[in-house]
Each structure stands twice: as structure tokens, then as C-alpha cells.
A protein has these predicted regions:
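Nucleic-acid endo/exonuclease domains
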Residues: 2-170
Length: 170
């Protein structure tokens, strides 16, 4: 803001608000830090899921359903007409056999029980899909990071229609 005097070149002192001192937030305990970190983990629309969906879209494989509730276990990506379900598993949560992620060091019994329940649920869904005659693919987060193109090729082959005698090693 400039002065309206004859010179008009000097500035008027603008009123500035004084900054109030803010106390820093209280330090979090280790348990609270872990809780805050885990709260940020999503179960839907994760980065690996978005990578696969984007690759499928660019490959022209459209018409999929995302987290389709009519299929057992709400697969991450599902082609109902082709009876093809794609599960994209995070290595940590589903205990990847390829990269074998480390167990958390705190509250070990809780984590062991949680991982066992996740693996039991995955086995239950595997059986339900086999009984229903669906093709089921499990893509691991580490596999997608290493070879997204190979995973996409597998999905394309199954989308075209592979004989039911062909089993997926997953």
C-alpha cells in the first residue's frame, strides 16, 4: 500500500498480525506412531491395484468390475462374464512366499494371529473359486514391481479363454 502524499513513493506501515506461539504437538509413543501409520494403509485402490487397472485399460481389457460384491471375497478386479477374478495381494499383509517380509517386532502374537487369519481367508476363497469353476489369479506386489508386463500377459491369456484344465500356479 503506497502513501497518497505528493511523493507517493514510500510505503505505509501495514498492520501485521502478531504470530502467536504454538506449542509443539506432544510426542507420540511408539504404539501411537504405529497406530497412526497403520491407519493410513488402505484396503482399496492401493498403488499396485491402480498400476494393474491402468495397464489393463491401456491393453484394451476393459469391462472389469472393481471389488465386485457378488464374487466371493470381493476380488480387486473381476471379469464376471469370463469368470475371472484377480486378487492383488500386498506382500506384508498376505505373507508373500516370494519375498518373505519380516514380522513386526512389537506385539508379535497379535500379528501372527492376524496373518494366520488372512492366510486362512485366502485359502477359503481359493476353494470357493475352484468349486464355482472360476479362474483366480493372485498377483503379488513384489511381482508387479518386477514384471508388470508378464502379469499383464497372463491376464490377457486368461481373458481370451484358456482351457479349464490349465491351472494357475499362484
Amino acid at each position: 500500500m503506497f502513501c497518497s502524499c505528493i511523493y507517493g513513493t514510500h510505503r505505509l506501515a501495514a498492520k501485521r498480525k502478531k504470530k502467536k506461539y504454538k506449542a509443539p504437538p506432544p510426542l507420540l509413543t511408539a504404539a501411537e506412531k504405529v497406530s497412526r501409520y497403520m491407519r493410513g494403509n488402505k484396503s482399496k485402490n492401493t498403488t499396485p491395484e491402480l498400476m494393474v487397472r491402468k495397464a489393463l485399460w491401456h491393453a484394451g481389457l476393459r469391462g472389469y468390475r472393481v471389488h465386485w460384491p457378488k464374487a466371493p471375497g470381493k476380488p480387486d478386479i473381476c471379469y464376471p462374464g469370463r469368470q475371472l477374478a484377480i486378487f492383488i495381494h500386498g506382500c506384508f499383509w498376505h505373507r508373500c512366499p516370494h519375498c518373505q517380509p519380516a514380522l513386526p517386532k512389537t506385539n508379535v502374537p497379535f500379528w501372527e494371529e492376524k496373518f494366520e487369519k488372512n492366510q486362512a481367508r485366502d485359502a477359503r476363497y481359493r476353494l470357493q473359486y475352484r468349486e464355482a469353476g472360476w479362474q483366480r489369479i493372485v498377483l503379488w506386489e513384489c511381482q508387479l514391481r518386477q514384471n508388470l508386463a508378464g502379469s499383464l500377459t497372463l491376464i490377457q491369456e486368461l481373458h481370451r479363454g484358456v482351457p479349464s484344465s490349465w491351472e494357475i500356479a499362484a
